[in-house]
Design a protein with these regions (language model features):
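Short, flexible loop segments at the rims of nucleotide/cofactor-binding pockets, characterized by
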Residues: 10-14, 110-115, 172
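Active-site proximal beta-strand in glycosyltransferases
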Residues: 3, 134, 138, 149-171
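Nucleotide-sugar donor phosphate/pyrophosphate-binding loop at the beta->alpha transition
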Residues: 116-119, 146, 169-172
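Short, solvent-exposed amphipathic helices
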Residues: 139-143
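Conserved nucleotide-sugar donor-binding subdomain of glycosyltransferases
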Residues: 74-134
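N-terminal subdomain of nucleotide-sugar transferases
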Residues: 1-80, 156
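Amphipathic coiled-coil/heptad-repeat helices and related helical stalk/stem segments
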Residues: 17, 21, 119-120, 145
Length: 172
């Protein structure tokens, strides 16, 4: 079975969301791919195929028409310096917005994602090449993540499995 995971965070065993994914799927002999929407390098032993979209890519798309999204394969244990095409977190930039969780920032972010071309041929190629049997997408309290999940579900015609965690509907 091929499972396409759609999540906001990168799949790292050391983070809460990544640890949950690893614990859920560790003993399954399935093939996994992930679409994620934040900077960072994956680090897990389960998933090898990734498609990354970030706020920075969205901004570059709006101002310079560079495509949103990067497809890559990752083998656990690779050094971050070996993966230069992956967008890594800018702690100062993201730290500011994490510290100052104002509604205007969320509105601006969603506006930028809405006017960018994230539903592009690169994303469709990644989805087509992987050809998932099912889509697994945690249910976030985030308009864009819900829109992305809906798009992928409609594009593939595949069933979506989702769940709600206890901390996704608060700004704290």
């Amino acid at each position: 079975m091929k499972v396409l995971i759609i999540s906001a965070e990168v799949w790292q065993d050391k983070t809460n969301g990544g640890n949950v994914l690893s614990n859920m799927f560790r003993n399954m002999d399935w093939e996994f791919a992930q679409i994620y929407c934040n900077p960072g390098m994956p680090d897990n032993m389960i998933c090898k195929k990734y498609y990354q979209m970030t706020d920075g890519m969205v901004i570059r798309n709006i101002f310079s028409h560079k495509p949103v999204g990067k497809e890559f394969e990752y083998i656990s244990g690779e050094k971050e310096s070996d993966r230069r095409e992956i967008e890594l977190p800018n702690q100062k930039f993201y730290g500011f917005f994490h510290k100052h969780r104002l509604g205007i920032f969320y509105s601006a972010k969603h506006f930028l994602w809405n006017i960018s071309n994230w539903k592009n041929e690169n994303l469709k190629k990644f989805i087509n090449d992987f050809s998932p049997d099912i889509i697994f997408a945690p249910c976030y309290g985030d308009q864009f993540m819900l829109r992305l999940t809906r798009f992928v579900g409609q594009y593939t015609g595949k069933k979506i499995i989702s769940y709600i965690s206890d901390d996704h509907y608060t700004l704290k």
